[in-house]
Amino acid sequence: PEIAELTGLHTCNSADEVGYFHCSKPLFNQIYELIDWAIRSNMASVLTDCPHREKLGWLEQSHLMQNSMQSRYDLSRLYAKIMNDMQSTQQADGMIPTIAPEVVRFEG
């Protein structure tokens, strides 16, 4: 059979929008929309740094992106989930892995 039509969907976290940027300069608006698309592309059940290949919840993204994201989205549910992921992966000695919820040990 021949494929007659194909539709792609952009999936991301359903966080409510709490802020927006718009100005009289079209270039600034385009830059804002590009950055917002990148943030939404990396904001699912975990925060990633490159949605086309990275699927692990590297926790530094939660720290590095929080200020940028909180002015645009309500992150309360996402960050509650991230904190729960951190708690559930915490080791007996108190160490929190750099990846949560899936703990990966890289050998090499």
Language model region names:
Residues 2-108:
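Substrate-binding groove/exosite segments of carbohydrate-active enzymes
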